[in-house]
């Protein structure tokens, strides 16, 4: 168990040390009437390089063929296109307070079936080097399905089972440690009591012998 604890602590320390940008895929199933976050994370290859980034999101509704632009985010300004499907529903949830955007995620509030389809997060980044500038572009694609009720995926079920198993194992280990410590303390206490009793008997016996010797001398 000590080894397991050391591994957990080590993992936490390593993750804290890295502490950089990590690209994570977006969830792809939204529940009707709920708020849904569409992830778009695009990390720089070299964190020390200065950069400026902006994004444009496009959408192709399920059953249609063309992508249409729904928003642009640049210089901390969100520009929404006139589209009744997204009017009053899109909220910026990406990087703030910087022109070097790496998290370009958005929220869609009060999701409807009209939001089912394909999303594209276009990332345009300008990198500044000592003697030149370099433009890069990346497209993150997300397919979204809107459902009536959330369906738990296998990964979340397995994670929950593993969590409960770990709790049970830790509880059993803790109880075993407590029982072991209790028995050890009880044994030590009993040994100390026996030692004290032996010393008391020895002192009593010696006192009697001394008293007998005094009476004989008289």
Curated annotation (Swiss-Prot):
Cysteine pairs bridged by disulfides in the record: 21-43, 40-121
GO cellular component: intercalated disc; node of Ranvier; perikaryon; plasma membrane; sodium channel complex; T-tubule; voltage-gated sodium channel complex
Disulfide bond recorded as keyword: yes
Subcellular locations according to the entry: Cell membrane; Perikaryon; Cell projection; Cell projection, Axon
UniProt source species: Rattus norvegicus (Rat)
Membrane topology: Single-pass type I membrane protein
Sequence similarity: Belongs to the sodium channel auxiliary subunit SCN1B (TC 8.A.17) family.
Record topology, Extracellular segments: 19-157
Residues annotated as domain Ig-like C2-type: 22-150
Tissue expression profile of the protein: Detected in brain (at protein level). Expressed in brain, heart, skeletal muscle and spinal cord.
Gene name of the encoded protein: Scn1b
Its job: Regulatory subunit of multiple voltage-gated sodium (Nav) channels directly mediating the depolarization of excitable membranes. Navs, also called VGSCs (voltage-gated sodium channels) or VDSCs (voltage-dependent sodium channels), operate by switching between closed and open conformations depending on the voltage difference across the membrane. In the open conformation they allow Na(+) ions to selectively pass through the pore, along their electrochemical gradient.
Protein's name according to its UniProt entry: Sodium channel regulatory subunit beta-1
GO biological process: axon guidance; cardiac conduction; cardiac muscle cell action potential involved in contraction; cardiac muscle contraction; corticospinal neuron axon guidance; locomotion; membrane depolarization; membrane depolarization during action potential
InterPro entries listed in its UniProt record: Ig-like_dom_sf, Ig-like_fold, Ig_V-set, Na_channel_b1/b3
Residues with attached carbohydrate: 93, 110, 114, 135
Subunit organization: A voltage-gated sodium (Nav) channel consists of an ion-conducting pore-forming alpha subunit functional on its own that is regulated by one or more beta subunits. Interacts with SCN1A; regulatory subunit of SCN1A/Nav1.1. Interacts with SCN3A; regulatory subunit of SCN3A/Nav1.3. Interacts with SCN4A; regulatory subunit of SCN4A/Nav1.4. Interacts with SCN5A; regulatory subunit of SCN5A/Nav1.5. Interacts with SCN8A; regulatory subunit of SCN8A/Nav1.6. Interacts with SCN9A; regulatory subunit of SCN9A/Nav1.7. Interacts with SCN10A; regulatory subunit of SCN10A/Nav1.8. Interacts with NFASC.
Record's keyword terms, sorted: Cell membrane, Cell projection, Disulfide bond, Glycoprotein, Immunoglobulin domain, Ion transport, Membrane, Signal, Sodium, Sodium transport, Transmembrane, Transmembrane helix, Transport
Record field: transmembrane: 158-179
Molecular function in Gene Ontology: sodium channel inhibitor activity; sodium channel regulator activity; transmembrane transporter binding
Pfam families: V-set (PF07686)
Record's signal peptide: 1-18
Membrane-side (Cytoplasmic) residue stretches: 180-218
